[in-house]
């Protein structure tokens, strides 16, 4: 097996592409309502992200019910129906092997809201205003640095 020579440690293009295919297929299955579970039928579920393992055998699906409430029963219902969902995802994709589906709560919306609130806090706004005024003022040291470099 060829060693991983990529730098940066991020996902490969194939991992990203397959993750996106799984995300679309899973969202399609959930949207059509073909799952007979009453918990899943009662919720509209979004699938913002799917992360693939390097060997493409495991798909970690980040899900969130619309409104963000009752996430625990939804995750349990998805896990209970993972076998059926995997079968349906496999029917919609042309892959050698269909990955195992694992479900996790998507916290990206909460993280985004937290960051937005943090950036809007008075202390951060004040600090950002201070740094922007420092960036616009001319720096007296740049001219002297150029003269010493030339010597």
From Swiss-Prot:
Its main location: cytoplasm. It is found in: Cytoplasm. Pfam families: RBFA. Keywords: Cytoplasm, Ribosome biogenesis. Gene3D superfamilies: 3.30.300.20. GO terms for molecular function: ribosomal small subunit binding. GO terms for cellular component: cytosol. Residues 120-151 are annotated as: Disordered. GO terms for biological process: maturation of SSU-rRNA. Monomer. Binds 30S ribosomal subunits, but not 50S ribosomal subunits or 70S ribosomes. Belongs to the RbfA family. One of several proteins that assist in the late maturation steps of the functional core of the 30S ribosomal subunit. Associates with free 30S ribosomal subunits (but not with 30S subunits that are part of 70S ribosomes or polysomes). Required for efficient processing of 16S rRNA. May interact with the 5'-terminal helix region of 16S rRNA. PANTHER family: RIBOSOME-BINDING FACTOR A, CHLOROPLASTIC-RELATED. HAMAP family: RbfA. This is Ribosome-binding factor A. The lineage of its organism: Bacteria, Pseudomonadati, Pseudomonadota, Alphaproteobacteria, Hyphomicrobiales. The gene is rbfA.
